[in-house]
Regions:
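Phosphate-group recognition and catalysis centered on beta-loop-alpha active-site segments
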Residues: 1-248
Length: 248
């Protein structure tokens, strides 16, 4: 399909761990495909290795998506780089775990947003917030970033280090008025799961609080719901399919 200018979309399309419906999640290849498909942004997850490197991967361990085992926090960058990332659809594909610096180097040549989720709710990574902000500043990408986490202490730490950063809360099921909670913390956005949109008054509460809404993970069946809700962004595994629906 021919891609239109992304700035015209009312609801932006962010690629969830890259175009992860087509390439192994959180790999450079997945992010490159998201760029080619015309996404407005990407979402990724960050951990810290034992030698202090910022590593892009969703899980705390490498077991699910690589040919290795173990926790990221216990492995060096060199050990992580030796692993091969694959998917059931591409078991013989040779992909590797990227660092955050490698992904940002790719994204800095675009005008796309980058949503970094700090994965420090199970394994704690002291100093992660400062390392990320330092790297982003060095790459002159501060205007392209938004930070999210289930660990709201981490979001507050980011705000303490730089009050101008954009942040969004991730939250578990059954919260009453998370938008007001986020506003009281000085957070800029809520990042609800797509089914949270069906909670009583949820959408109205977000709008009343004056916050942005970035919804995950919405694929074809749920995209119209997200569009109708007036979300500022949808986070999806299939950016090309999302674009078709959002632009109708």
């Amino acid at each position: 399909m021919e891609m239109t200018e992304t700035t015209k979309r009312t609801t932006k399309v962010w690629a969830h761990r890259g175009a992860s419906g087509y390439r192994p999640e959180n790999t450079l290849e997945a992010f490159e495909l998201a760029i080619r498909q015309g996404a407005d942004g990407i979402e990724l997850d960050v951990h810290t290795s034992v030698d202090g490197e910022l590593i892009v991967m969703h899980d705390e361990n490498v077991d699910r998506v690589t040919d290795g085992t173990g926790l990221i926090k216990d492995m060096t960058l060199a050990q992580l780089k030796e692993l091969k990332v694959s998917t059931p659809a591409e078991p013989s594909g040779i992909y590797h775990i990227p660092t955050l610096a490698e992904v940002l180097e790719l994204m800095r040549t675009t005008d796309m947003m980058v949503n970094i989720e700090l994965k420090n709710s199970i394994c704690f990574y002291p100093g992660m917030e400062g390392k990320i902000l330092k790297l982003v500043k060095e790459m002159n990408m501060e205007d392209q970033l938004i930070y999210s986490s289930f660990n709201h202490y981490s979001l507050l730490q980011l705000k303490q280090l730089n009050d101008h950063v954009q942040t969004g809360i991730l939250f578990s099921d059954g919260w009453v008025n998370p938008a007001m909670y986020a506003k009281n913390l000085g957070i800029n956005a809520v990042h609800p799961a797509v089914y949270h949109l069906k909670y009583p008054q949820f959408i109205e509460e977000v709008k009343r609080a004056g916050l942005k809404m970035h919804v995950w993970t919405a694929n074809k069946p749920e995209l119209q719901l997200v569009k109708d809700a007036g979300a500022e962004a949808v986070i999806t595994n299939y950016p090309d399919r999302a674009i078709e629906i959002i632009e109708k």
